[in-house]
Amino acid sequence: LRVAQRLLARGDEVWALRRHPPMLDHGAIHWLSADLTQPESLRNLPRGITRLVYLPTPDRREPAAYRATFVDGLQHLLDALGRQSLQRVLLVSSSAVYGEQGGHWVDEHTPAVPRGFNGAVLLEAEQLLAAQPVTSIVLRLAGLYGPGRLQLLERLRAGRAAVPRTLPHWANRIHVDDAAAAIVHLLAL
């Protein structure tokens, strides 16, 4: 909702898709009920969509659910929207595509060598998007924190995570509001 609210504040019209749209009114967001893994549920999407932010959530943390959501779902949605009016697609990915880098700096020039299924599937989705005839942007986020995203803090408090003792120790963290601002900025380029 953070991205949608920022887009609305800019004066943009916002359509949002979820399997189960929220019951609460979130202002001027036009909610659509559909399932990215079910192409037939995407048949009646509005025409004239110019920008797409793709940041879905798989219903399970396992390879088939990730592929169905990030790869197949992206293809289904692009097919349903058509390419006529679509000018830009932004995929929210993850630094998991880089795999483990042994504590070294990671940037856009670091080779993507995912170790887990999540990184491998996200990289596949990135490649699918790059092959499309539309301007595409991939934002590889890591360490989101903020309201509702306190997993690391909760693990530290519960003793299930430890603070590294060796210095320096670098971590990738971004506040959810800063991530939303970055997405909106990239859409406007």
List PLM regions with ranges.
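Catalytic helix-loop patch of NAD(P)-dependent Rossmann-fold dehydrogenases
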Residues: 102-138, 164
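Substrate-positioning beta->alpha
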Residues: 149-154, 165-186
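Glycine/proline-rich active-site loop of Rossmann-fold NAD(P)-dependent oxidoreductases
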Residues: 120-123, 132-134, 145-159, 185-189
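NAD(P)-cofactor binding segment of oxidoreductase domains
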Residues: 49-90, 124
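Conserved Rossmann-fold cofactor-binding substructure of NAD(P)-dependent oxidoreductases
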Residues: 28-50
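N-terminal Rossmann NAD(P)H-binding glycine-rich loop of SDR-like oxidoreductase domains
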Residues: 1-10
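N-terminal Rossmann-fold cofactor-binding loop
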Residues: 16-22, 36
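Conserved Rossmann-fold NAD(P)-dependent oxidoreductase catalytic core, especially the SDR/UDP-sugar
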Residues: 76-117
